[in-house]
Amino acid sequence: MKLKTLMLLTLASSIAMADTASSSSSDAHARALFYGLMAVAAGVSIGLGALGAGVGAGSAIRGAEEGMARNPNMAGKLQTIMFIGLAFIETFALYAMLFSIIFVFTGIFSGKAGF
């Protein structure tokens, strides 16, 4: 409960700071709000991607360790399969980071990208 409250207060304060930092013209205000919310969205997407990858990696390692404990002769094969699976799991976090970087730095939603 405290984490949810802290997250909501952080989001509200970042929006309020973006609101007060903009100039008096409505175009500058809209631009500041847009880029502020884009930064928040990028951070949330990276966080959720890392959360999913962490949960998946933990589950994969737990399963491999249980298999190695049950049958120590299969430890080498299980370890190889686990490392391949971990490589695939980590791609989710990397894709989340890649999409966030693309959205923030290319201006794809602001019309600057030429699409």
Curated annotation (Swiss-Prot):
Pfam short name (any one): ATP-synt_C
Membrane topology: Multi-pass membrane protein
Record-annotated membrane-spanning stretches: 32-52, 83-103
Protein location: Cell inner membrane
Gene3D superfamilies (UniProt xref): F1F0 ATP synthase subunit C (1.20.20.10)
Self-association and partners: F-type ATPases have 2 components, F(1) - the catalytic core - and F(0) - the membrane proton channel. F(1) has five subunits: alpha(3), beta(3), gamma(1), delta(1), epsilon(1). F(0) has three main subunits: a(1), b(2) and c(10-14). The alpha and beta chains form an alternating ring which encloses part of the gamma chain. F(1) is attached to F(0) by a central stalk formed by the gamma and epsilon chains, while a peripheral stalk is formed by the delta and b chains.
Family stated for the protein in its record: Belongs to the ATPase C chain family.
Protein name: ATP synthase subunit c
Organism for this UniProt entry: Hydrogenobaculum sp. (strain Y04AAS1)
The gene coding this protein: atpE
